Every structure is written in structure tokens, then in C-alpha cells.
């Protein structure tokens, strides 16, 4: 069998299982008595081990096997969760991630894991011996199912939630060449509709193919016996399937209480914890049993689909214009129907490309844990807006810039605990990672309450490196000085000690974000902290806009940025702090004249009434003054090309139905 056809699936699922292990281990560090977390990590490691063995990645399979032994020892009460032991587990995960990355890069996934294997063997030797003894015992009484305390607890709670327990006997064809592959395929099928609780022989024996043609599975599901049998028979080279529904496990069947007294008390809190959350577990169980159906699609195919749809939108706009000119009722109705249908199609296509930023954010708690240990600092990380969605192609690229900014916040921004106490700050530094939509952009902010940027030292270093001249230095405002840290001249190692707060390689961050069509800016208050703000395009090439007029020119404003449109009297505009504002629903909102911003001659200065559009960036509103509103329309966002990359407050252009080109306004650049 050619395993290359499964490689993409293996890589995607391996990354998901490793992420699960990382997240659950961080939670386990906070609550070492929660055995449900141990069980979740065990399941992820077990699945990864089976996949790795099937694909032939022996180092991956071996290391996850050792990981599994230790986790099994914990859930059986033979080991306790300690900080040192968690460090070893995290180290093992680092090796696993490196091996998976090697496979992604076209390598063989091999790595020297002797050192970490020795650490895991020391901690899990007794678990290994117990695991190795299990197959012989299981095979000697293959028809008698015996469950340990943890397995019994899991099964009983599943039965209380309405699950059925099936004991399934499966026979493979005598001529089956890849028994482990067939077993893996059976498990994949079963895991779509329930959960495999136990196997005879053990999973390790099944993976090494050290068994005959028969194996047994204890399976928990809502499905009927007939459905399960049909599901398994869908796998090739299955000779026979026998599905028997087991009688519910009762408390009378539990081992004697004396056994529980001999084992650590950690097993009891795990059960109590799970009883506290029946609704959550039940919801998860139903979701698992339901088996949501997904399909993996190459991103290039989605790009091609989007390109074709863009052409459809352009033609649709042209048809709308023709229907308007001809004033033909049937044509108008047909175009309106096509508009509605294509609008639904557009939403589906765009949503297919969108991924929540939590796929990137999830790596940072683990990174911060490691940095705390290395730097002897205490950090509290807050993540806000992880559900914010961004195009997949952008998501794949923003990880490294964010890692760089967060490392800078912790390494050079947050002070040591004793220094913070001397300054009257809490001992633990705070880092806030926030994401939110604004118009056709996503903003990601990294904020800390550390030392902030040292204005004087930044200026000194900028002059020393020749980034600016002394004459320029005299005229720079604070925010312009802070922006100097993104200059290439600052990306040298000695900047760590010379500039209080930031300075290493931030030009790389800026270049990367600009290559994605985004930007980065910084605000800081010395002694109070810094805020780095990343602006990224949603890369939604088809957007809904409001067309407006400025003199004879047509412009477009993204609907997603607009709060409201209105017509007001000129006398309603107030003057405060050298700025013009309006009272908008009880809030003071600054006024921006778009014709002034774009240097368009104003021939209507004496107009008594003004058309305004109230837009927002995050929670900041601003009122744009325009000449008139034309109407709402779906348009294709086009780049201005390489020659017009830095046009102020313009994010792109579009071709309207009548052939006119309209510039699309970047509201975020105009909001104060």
C-alpha cells in the first residue's frame, strides 16, 4: 500500500494531537489531580503513536509509546504529577514536534531521542513492565474482559450518559499482509461514531502485528450493533465481525475498596471533577458520537474557485448596470435573483478559507511557560478574541512575527519580579494578546505592563547607527521615535542591553507583515508598558461597500466599517480642543473631511447640509463628511499594483458595472 496518499492527513492530524497534548499539559500543571486531562493526553498520544507506526515513522512511534507509558502510570495512581516530570513531558513534545516538522519538510522524521527516552524510561519503567505483561494476560483469557479502576470509571460514566458498551470480535483474512494498517482503519471508522475504550491484545501488540488474525475491541457508542457491524465490514480484508452488547457495569462489580485504599487518592478527585461537569461531557460525547463530516481541500483549489467567482461578480455588476439602463422588469428580476444566489455562494466560499486565530494563539501559553523558567519572571497571559477569523494563507504566516513580539515583551519589556516590586507594580507581569475585526482588516495587539520604551536611548542608538540625522532627531515626535525600533539598523545583538524594552530584529517582523499587505505600529509609555498593533487584511477579495461621491469621483467604503449614515446641518458641528466634532447619540465623535484628506478641491463649502458616514475602528468612532451616497454594492477588491503600494488611506480599487474605477478607502488609516 502506498502510504504517501495518507501523508497530508497524517501531518494535519499529528499537529492537532500535539497541540492537544500541549494545551492539556498546561492545564494539568494547574490542576495535577484532574485525571480527565491525563486521559485526554493519553488518547492524543495513543492515536499519534498508532498513526506513526502505521506510516512507518518508528522514532515517533517509540517516543509516543514511552510517553503513553508514563501517562498510564499516572492515571493508574503509580506516579504523581510534578513540575520536574512535566518538564520532561514538554521536552518529549518538543522532540515530537521537531520530528513532525521534519516530515513536513520532506525528511524521514528521525531524530536522536536517546536522552529524552532515558528520562521517560526512568519515570515509566514500572509502567513499561506492567504494559508488557498485559498482552500475555489478555491473550490467555481473550474472552474475559477485565477492566482496571480507571477504565471502569470511564465506562460507567459513559453508560450513565446513554452510551452502549459493545464487545467486538474481529477476524482478519488469513492472507492479510498489513494487519496493523487494517486495525488502524477499523479504529478510524469506530472513532467517527464513538470511542474505543480497550483492546485485546493491547494496542502495542496490534501495532507490531504480534498477533494472529483475531482481535477484540471494547467500544462505547450510541449506535446499534447492526450499524457497527456494517461500519467495520466496510474495511477491506475483514473476514468476520461479531458485535455483542455488554451488560452495564454496576458498582457491585467494582474491585474491593481495599484496592482503592492502597492506590493514591488522586483517582478520586478525577472522578469527582468529571461528575461536576456532566453537561459538558455529555455535549462532547454527543458531538463525538455524531461524527461531524469534514473533507480536506487543497488551498490552491480554493484560490482557483475564488478567482472564478471574482470574474462572476464583475459580470454580475455589469448585468446590474445593463438592467438598470434598459429598465426591463424580467431582466431586473433575474439579475436580482442571481445576486441573491451568488451572494450566498460568496459567503460559503469565503468561510471555507477562514480560520480562527486561536490556531496561532494556542502555541503561546506553552512558550510563555518556558520563558518564565528561563528568565525567572512571573507572567500572566490574557488572550482576547481568539475566535476572530482570518484567511488561512495569512494565518500560516503570522506565527513567527507574533512569537517575536511576545518574546520581546517578556524578555525585554517585563521587569524581574524584584524590580517590579520596587516600582510598586504587581510581582507578575501582564501580557495581553488581543484580536478583533475592523472593516476589512483584522487587528492583533500585543500589550505588556513592563518598562516601556526608553525614548532617550532609542534616539542615541538611532544617531549612532545613522538611522536618522541630528537635525531630524530634533523634529521627531515620540511616536515617530518609537517607530525607529523597526529600522534595520536596530537588528543587532547588543541592542538587548542598550535599549530598555525592545530592539532585536523587529525589522524582520515589519517586513514580514508588510509582505502580507499588513503593517505594525507601536505605542509606549516609559515605565508603564508598550502596545504593538498589527493590522492585517482579511484578504477577502470580494467585499460589500457603500459607494459615495467626492465631487465627480466615486469612492467605496467597506460596509463592515460603517456604523450609520446620516444627513446633518452644518450648525450641528461643534468645536473642541482645536477639532471639529459632532454629538452622535450621546457620544462626542471627531469629524474628518474626506476631500481635505485626499486633497480634492471643495466646491460645496457653503452647503447647509452635510452627508456623514460614522465608521469605527475597534471602539473608536469617526464621522466622515462626503458629498453624497450612491448605494451599496458587492465589489471585487483589486490591488493598486507594485507602483502604488503606499497610497495614504487607500486599500485598493474596484471596477464598477459601468467600467468606472472606484478607490476603496481604508477607514482605519483615517480614524484618530
From Swiss-Prot:
A GO biological process of this protein is:
chemotaxis
Q: For the Histidine kinase domain, which residue ranges apply?
A: 290-540
Q: Which SMART domains match?
A: CheW (SM00260), H-kinase_dim (SM01231), HATPase_c (SM00387), HPT (SM00073)
PTM-bearing positions, type Phosphohistidine = 46
> Where would you say this protein principally sits, based on its record?
membrane
Gene Ontology, cellular component aspect: cytoplasm; membrane
- Gene (name only): cheA
Keyword set for this entry?
A: ATP-binding, Chemotaxis, Kinase, Membrane, Nucleotide-binding, Phosphoprotein, Transferase, Two-component regulatory system
Q: What is this protein called?
A: Chemotaxis protein CheA
Biological classification of the source: Bacteria, Bacillati, Bacillota, Bacilli, Bacillales
What residue spans carry the region label Disordered? 250-292
Question: Which species is listed as the source?
Answer: Bacillus subtilis (strain 168)
Give the location in the cell: Membrane
Q: Which residues form the HPt domain?
A: 1-103
Q: Which InterPro entries match?
A: Bact_Chemotaxis_CheA, CheA-like_dim, CheA-like_homodim_sf, CheA-like_P2_sf, CheA_P2-bd, CheW-like_dom_sf, CheW-lke_dom, CheY-binding_CheA
Q: Could you tell me the EC number(s) of this protein?
A: 2.7.13.3
The CheW-like domain is annotated at: 542-672
A matching Pfam family: CheW
* Enzyme class, UniProt record, top EC level: transferase
This enzyme catalyses: ATP + protein L-histidine = ADP + protein N-phospho-L-histidine
Q: What does this protein do?
A: Involved in the transmission of sensory signals from the chemoreceptors to the flagellar motors. CheA is autophosphorylated; it can transfer its phosphate group to CheB, CheY or CheV.
MF terms from GO for this chain are: ATP binding; phosphorelay sensor kinase activity
Instruction: Quote the biased-composition stretches of kind Basic and acidic residues, using this chain's numbering.
Output: 253-262, 271-286
